[in-house]
Amino acid sequence: MRLFARVMLGRHPCYWIVGLSVAFSAPVAMAADSPLLECAAVVNPTERLACYDRLAGADKPAVDNHPAAAGPPPAALPTANPATPAVPLVMSEPTPMSRLWELETGTRNDVFTLQPYQLMYAMPVKYSDAVNQTPFRGQFHGENGASAQLQDVEAKFQISGKMKVADDLLWDNAAFWLAYTQESHWQIYNHAISAPFRETDYEPEAFLVFPTQYQLFGFNARFVSLGVVHQSNGESDPLSRSWNRVYAEFGLERGNFSLMIKPWWRIPESASSDDNPDISNYIGRGELQGIYRFDKSLISVTLRDNLRADNHGSARIDYVFPIYKKLNGYVQFFSGYGESLIDYNFRQDTIGVGISVGDGI
């Protein structure tokens, strides 16, 4: 024990604790022939230190108690992906012009299907600031036989429809249409002359429609139409009025705005059969129509001009607004010549209110 204490308290004081432990456990260690005594008996300090290290396990590899830093997750094994269901291609909504003239594949109807053409409306009340009495002078008589006058308030209505009779013409690029429009002016409140129809104009026509796809002044050019139209009031002289025209119409669109440009040429008639030789100088030689659609409503402005210095023609404004489903409210304002065929050379301003049904223009 004296040797062990001398060694432990010699040049290495750091082993006092170890030495004290050995001293307190000496009886047991000596009885068990403890290896600590063997290390204590080593004279060389370096070798003695190595001996104690071996006993303490210092020469074993250090064990890292800290978890290893997480690395990237292992790459997933490739697996067969389930088949992705096909998503149907969502097409853009057809424009009003496409629907009216079937300019795209998804808008086409069968031939011989009756469809809207011009606006169909009924105005129970239409007021005129000037009434054309001249053509009817002597035509209407009251109950006492005296000549009666037309009233400045009457009703007006129009029916119109079109039908495609052939498709895929001329290199599969044209459709042939027939159309009919009828407009009536009814002196419904004029009981003095038995509430007659003052004027009814009949307008059948036939035309080819060619779809187009090009840009023009920021507009999408959608179609070109070539047609012939007859318009008459079905009366005999002196009230007969009629004319025949050929026309070209160009349809343009830009957003909610549609523009139709329609020049025409009157087919000449013989002087003996022409009831209204100067009709082009009043009703005009062409028409420009702009339509703006918004919130299921539309405003249409139609301008006609004779393309002469005196600038005769007309302007018409139509306002259509929704009431219930296909039933719409309708307001019409007209100013100029030709509000009807019998009035082709008579100027007046009119305004009327009523209802419109279905789609048109």
Explain the meaning of each model-derived region:
Residues V331, Q348-I361:
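Outer-membrane beta-barrel "beta-signal"
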Residues A31-N65:
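Alpha-helical, heptad-rich or low-complexity scaffold/stalk segments
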Residues R48, L170, S258, L298-S300, ...:
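Membrane-spanning beta-strand positions in outer-membrane beta-barrel proteins
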Residues S25-A26:
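N-terminal signal peptide c-region/cleavage motif recognized by signal peptidases
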Residues E287-Y330, F334-S340:
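Long, repeat-rich segments with strong aromatic
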Residues P61-P196, T200-P204:
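Outer-membrane beta-barrel initiation region
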Residues M1-R11:
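N-terminal secretory signal peptides that target proteins for export/translocation
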Residues Q133-N144, Q151-D152, A166-Y292, L303, ...:
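Outer-membrane pore/translocation modules
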